[in-house]
Curated annotation (Swiss-Prot):
Family: Belongs to the CinA family.
Stated name of the protein: Putative competence-damage inducible protein
Signal peptide limits: none
Superkingdom, natural source: Bacteria
SMART domains, per database record: MoCF_biosynth
C-alpha cells in the first residue's frame, strides 16, 4: 500500500509551526510496511485542497489528512472532501453530546460553530478523540482509503496510534502480523554503516531492513511479516543477530532507547555513581541524564564552570595548567573530570570543555570539544571531537558522544550492558 500525507493549514506554509505530524505518521506507517512517497502541505483554501486531493488520488491508495477539522470557517477539510467525493456530512451524536457536555461542565456557552466539529462523512468509521473535540474518521471510496485526523499533535498522535493504526493493520494483514524493531547506533556514519551491512540490505526480503540517519545517530528498522507475533519476532531476532555480528560494536540500544537512557541504565545496573563538570555544555549532560527516571541513584551532582576563573575556584584546577594548555584542551578536560569525581565522591567524573561556536575564544577552531572521563582511581581518559554544526547542535552532540564513550569504557572494564 502506498500512502500520501496531506497536511492542511496556512500556518504550516507560513512557517508559524513545524509539521511534526507528518514525521510521526510516516514513522507509524513504516512500522506497518506502508510506503510514504509524498508529503503535501496545503493552505486553508478549498480549491487548492481539492486539487491536492486529486493529485494524491493519482499516486496513493491511502491518503491521510491532518488538520482542518475544527470549528472555524478556515477548517474546511471535511467539507472539501465531502464535495469532492460526492458524499454528505452528518452529525455524529456521540461526538456532539461530548462537545455539549464539555462546555456545560465548564459553565461556558457553546457557540453554534462548535457543532461543526461533530460533522462526519456519511458512511465513515469514527476515530474517537479522547484528547479533544473533533472526531477523526476513516472512509473508503473507489479503491482509496481516506483518514481524517485533527491537527493538534496531542490529539492526532494518540488517535492515530490507538484508533487508526490498529484498523489499518487489520486491513493490511488479513490475519497476519507485522512487527518492527529499531536498532540504534552511534559513533558510525550512515554511509559506513551501510557499507558494513550492504549484503544484508541487498538480499533483504522478509524481514526488511531500512537505514536512517538523524542528529548524529544511525538507525536500522527491521520489519517482519508473519502469521503470528511469535514468528515475526523470531524473524526479527535472527536478522538483528546477523546485523550485530557485523556492526554490534556501534549499537547502543533498541526502539525508544536514547544514549542518555542507556547510560543511566548501565550506571544503575552496575551500581555506579557519576558527577560532571561542564563548560561548553553548561549542564546539558546532567540535564539529559536527569530526564531519565531513577537517575537519582546514579547522578550525585555537578558544577558548571564556564569561565576559566570558575575552573580554578570551584574545581581547584591550577592556573598554570590553564596558562600552559588552555581551557579547551585534553589536559583541562582530564583535570575537570578528576576534580569533580573527587569533589562529589563518585565512581565516575566527566569533564566537558570546548568551543561550541559561533566564534572561537581560546584559539581553537569552532567545534573543538574535549571530553574527559575519570573512572575510580584510574588516570582520566580524554577524547577529542571536531564537530561541525550550529552552536546548540554541537553542544548536544558533545553530550551524546560523552554517553557513547562512557558506555564503551565501562563495557571494556567488564560492566554489564543491556540491549
Amino acid at each position: 500500500m502506498n500512502a500520501e500525507i496531506l497536511a492542511v493549514g496556512s500556518e504550516l506554509l507560513l512557517g508559524q509551526i513545524t509539521n511534526t505530524n507528518a514525521r510521526f505518521i510516516s514513522n507509524q506507517l513504516s512500522e506497518l510496511g506502508i510506503n510514504v512517497f509524498y508529503h503535501t502541505v496545503v493552505g486553508d483554501n478549498a480549491k487548492r485542497l481539492e486539487q491536492a486531493i486529486e493529485v494524491a488520488e493519482s499516486r496513493a491508495d491511502l491518503i491521510i489528512f491532518s488538520g482542518g477539522l475544527g470549528p472555524t470557517k478556515d477548517d474546511l477539510t471535511k467539507e472539501t472532501i465531502a464535495r469532492h467525493l460526492g458524499v454528505s456530512l452528518e452529525f455524529d451524536e456521540v461526538a456532539l453530546t461530548y462537545i455539549e457536555q464539555f462546555f456545560a461542565k465548564r459553565g461556558r456557552p457553546m457557540t453554534e460553530n462548535n457543532r461543526k466539529q461533530a460533522l462526519i462523512l456519511a458512511g465513515s468509521e469514527i476515530l474517537a478523540n479522547h484528547h479533544g473535540m473533533a472526531p477523526g474518521m476513516i472512509f473508503n471510496n473507489n479503491n482509496h482509503t481516506y483518514i481524517l485526523l485533527p491537527g493538534p499533535p496531542k490529539e492526532l498522535e494518540p488517535m492515530f496510534q490507538f484508533e487508526a493504526k490498529p484498523k489499518l493493520a487489520a486491513m493490511l494483514n488479513d490475519g497476519g502480523i507485522i512487527a518492527s524493531h529499531v536498532m540504534r547506533f552511534y559513533g558510525i556514519g550512515e554511509a559506513e554503516l551501510e557499507v558494513q551491512v550492504q549484503d544484508i540490505l541487498d538480499a533483504q526480503t522478509n524481514p526488511t531492513v531500512a537505514p536512517l540517519a538523524s542528529d548524529g545517530e544511525v538507525t536500522l528498522r527491521v520489519t517482519a511479516k508473519a502469521e503470528t507475533e511469535q514468528q515475526a519476532q523470531q524473524l526479527i531476532a535472527a536478522k538483528v543477530a546477523e546485523i550485530q555480528a557485523l556492526v554490534g560494536d556501534y549499537q547502543y540500544g533498541m526502539d525508544d532507547d536514547s544514549l542518555a537512557s542507556k547510560t543511566v541504565e548501565m550506571l544503575l545496573d552496575n551500581h555506579l555513581t557519576i558527577s560532571a563538570a561542564e563548560s561548553l555544555t553548561a549542564g546539558l549532560f546532567q540535564s539529559e541524564l536527569a530526564e531519565i527516571p531513577g537517575v537519582g541513584d546514579a547522578l550525585i551532582g555537578g558544577v558548571v564552570t564556564y569561565a576559566a576563573e570558575a575552573k580554578v575556584k570551584h574545581l581547584g584546577i591550577s592556573q598554570e595548567l590553564i596558562d600552559t594548555h588552555g581551557v579547551v584542551s585534553g589536559e583541562c578536560a582530564a583535570a575537570m573530570a578528576s576534580a569533580v569525581r573527587k569533589q562529589f565522591g563518585t565512581n565516575i567524573g566527566i569533564g566537558l570543555t570546548g568551543e561550541a561556536g559561533p566564534t572561537a575564544h581560546d584559539h581553537q577552531p569552532v567545534g573543538t570539544v574535549w571530553i574527559g572521563i575519570a573512572i575510580n582511581d584510574e588516570e582520566p581518559l580524554t577524547y577529542l571531537l571536531h564537530l561541525s554544526g550550529m552552536r546548540n547542535t554541537n553542544r548536544l552532540r558533545a553530550v551524546k558522544f560523552t554517553c557513547h564513550y562512557l558506555m564503551q569504557l565501562l563495557e571494556e572494564r567488564g560492566y554489564t550492558k543491556r540491549y
